[in-house]
Amino acid sequence: MSTKELREGFTTGACSAAAAKAATRLLLKGEPVLEIETTLPNDRQVLFPVKRCQLEGEVAICSVVKDAGDDPDCTHGAELTARVRLTKESKIVLKGGDGVATVTKTGLGIEVGEPAINPIPRKNISEMILEELKGSSFNGAEVEISVPGGQEMAKKTMNKRLGLIGGISIIGTTGIVKPFSTAAFKASVIQAIRMAREYEVDTVILTTGGKSEKFAMNLFPNLKELSFIQAGDFIGTGIKTSVKEFIRHVIVVGMIGKLSKMADGVMMTHRGGSSVNTKMLSDIARSVGIPEPIAIDIQNANTARHALEICKENGYEIITTKICEIVARNCSKHAGTNMSISCYMVDFDGTLLGKFENFSQKSKLRKGI
């Protein structure tokens, strides 16, 4: 039976970079820009249609409408708008305009007071502008990203709770939106595990996303490519299917946010469906001997990432190993069998932070082909 291929979408970050590049080209060429080709953070070339294209003296305003693909969220249809002015100075100054949130709490990887434009989109926006400036008499630019209606969109997110006030966040690590929360994606996870078993793969690596999959491949270079499965928010589905398909060993690889939810017993980890229980994280901290003042700081953290930063700053990375152990045990309970389940936590740059290994005697990480 054939299955419909999932249609990917594009992140707010990718659309912002495209809009900024279009505005830069408009300033340099002085001619309407109907479409713009950009390079996503994952190095893919994409052609975006440009909706708004307006020249006002030394300023250009262009916009790109976000298409979220087969997993539309509250930002689907958002008009990512870039207002650009070119400068002689060799730097890109990035500002947040109407509809883009401002960071008011620590722990998000962005300085307090800065617009909620994540590091990778910031880099992508700068790179696309500089690409256009090659060979021109300009060396930099002032860029303002705005999203009409962003404040209303933000009401459907957790932004306010996280201290992101005034609009949505400009996010995305690859530029691509994969439809992790659709029934179709769930079906694709099941299909991938069945295919792995068909090719006699006895160990599968369930990852929570593209970045963690890339890092997992570095951790296990000898495994077949079929072993690596992006389960997204459906780790629980991946585990249950692995049991049905007689997979001998499951390894879960993820980052602090998703694994913290799984340590709390949540097997459907979509960020809109559940939030990280920092009280639970503080209890884990106490269980491994982390002093009470630090445990309280962990409980009061804004995010799991913030909690991790607190542990790192105080030399208590040991919590990551305990989280991995709890995740592995929760996954084993979810499986309902004695199937071997291990867990690895990676940092945002791929560094291995902690692991809990549960290899059976018969399970071997066989060399891939």
Swiss-Prot record:
UniProt KW keywords: Cobalamin biosynthesis, Methyltransferase, S-adenosyl-L-methionine, Transferase
GO function term, MF aspect, one: cobalt-precorrin-5B C1-methyltransferase activity
Transmembrane intervals: none
Catalyses which reaction(s): Co-precorrin-5B + S-adenosyl-L-methionine = Co-precorrin-6A + S-adenosyl-L-homocysteine
Pathway noted in the entry: Cofactor biosynthesis; adenosylcobalamin biosynthesis; cob(II)yrinate a,c-diamide from sirohydrochlorin (anaerobic route): step 6/10
Group of enzyme by EC: transferase
EC number: 2.1.1.195
GO biological process: anaerobic cobalamin biosynthetic process; methylation
NCBIfam families with a match to the protein in the record: cbiD (TIGR00312), PRK00075.1-1 (NF000849)
Similarity comment text for this entry: Belongs to the CbiD family.
Name of protein: Cobalt-precorrin-5B C(1)-methyltransferase
Organism field: Leptospira borgpetersenii serovar Hardjo-bovis (strain JB197)
Lineage: Bacteria, Pseudomonadati, Spirochaetota, Spirochaetia, Leptospirales
Gene: cbiD
